[in-house]
A protein has these predicted regions:
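Active-site acidic short loop of glycosyltransferases
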Residues: 2, 73-76
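Cell-envelope/extracellular polymer assembly enzymes that use nucleotide-activated donors
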Residues: 4-6
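Short, well-formed alpha-helical segments that are part of the catalytic scaffolds
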Residues: 8-28
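Acidic helix N-cap motif at the loop->helix transition within catalytic regions
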Residues: 19, 41-50, 90
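A conserved acidic beta->alpha catalytic loop
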Residues: 24, 36-45, 82
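Short beta-strand/loop segment that forms part of the nucleotide-sugar
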Residues: 30-38, 55, 83
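Catalytic-site signature of metal-activated, phosphate-bearing donor transferases
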Residues: 64-70, 77, 88-261
Length: 263
């Protein structure tokens, strides 16, 4: 029996990953909302096997797309997933139990953070490694009390009353299949870097290119050691290097935008 909660996903050309995401929520809900930005690789056709609630919307930024998606949901309890994130069996049960116990959210709980754990490869179907890079982020919430902010880059969930982005943590995990290939990884880093740089310049933030050059080794150590990319072996080493290069690239693009902003 499906529960009074909605799942919504924003996507673009995700035919190779969306299927396993949708499979992971089968039986959890009767309301799966897909917001597609113009896929031409079969993503929409794949999604239609799981839901008829598929909406086209030209890309306007991560936060704005999610604001649009949550408004389309039928229920107040909402689980947001990216198109490369798989719900673990433990999280499936945890969310099911929570909604079944209090379907109308009588305690007015705004939301919960979920551990999003990185999986090294799209082709690795095992659960994420114990020490794999993990990021806690708000994903399961009551849209009356929490929601996403309009941003071209960031998609942080926030409490509508207090503005806080901190929520209680659930025990279950989301498995994050973020990298299809190294080529895909570089393309993704380039896209994020340009979007972030544009947002910085629009907000009046000046680039700090010299400082970033000097700090690049520290950025690498942060990703490789503190964020535990070492747990992914040689692939983690390459990812840490790429993320460090992306940080420098972001400042370089911002410097160009800042230099040419009045031309």
């Amino acid at each position: 029996m499906s529960l009074p909660l909605s799942v919504f996903i924003i996507c673009y050309n995700e035919v190779d990953r969306l299927g396993m995401v949708l499979e992971s929520v089968v039986g959890l809900t009767d309301d799966i909302v897909i917001v597609d930005s113009g896929s031409d690789d079969g993503t929409v056709e794949l999604a239609s096997k799981y839901t008829d609630r598929i909406f086209h919307r030209d890309w306007t930024g991560f936060g704005d797309q999610k604001v649009y998606g949550e408004k389309l949901c039928k229920y107040n309890w909402v689980l947001n997933l990216d198109a490369d994130e798989v719900v673990s069996p433990k999280l499936f049960k945890e969310i099911s139990d929570l909604v079944r116990r209090d379907p109308k959210n009588s305690e007015n709980q705004a939301g919960f953070e979920v551990a999003v754990k990185m999986v090294a490869s799209l082709y690795d179907r095992r659960p994420a490694r114990w020490l794999a890079p993990t990021n806690y982020t708000g994903r399961f919430y009551d849209r009356r009390y929490a929601g996403f902010a309009d941003s071209s880059v960031h998609d942080k969930l926030h409490n509508r009353e207090s503005g806080s982005v901190k929520f209680p943590k659930l025990q279950g995990e989301i498995y994050h299949y973020s990298i299809k290939s190294y080529e895909h990884m570089w393309s993704k880093i380039g896209f994020y870097s340009e979007a972030q740089a544009r947002e910085w310049v629009m907000k009046g933030r000046k680039p700090r290119l010299g400082l970033v050059y000097l700090a690049a080794p520290l950025f690498f150590m942060k990703h490789f050691l503190l964020r535990r990319l070492f747990a992914l072996g040689s692939r983690g080493f390459v990812i840490a290097l790429a993320l460090t290069a992306g940080r420098v690239l972001r400042e370089a693009i911002a410097a160009d935008f800042y230099k040419n902003r009045d031309q």
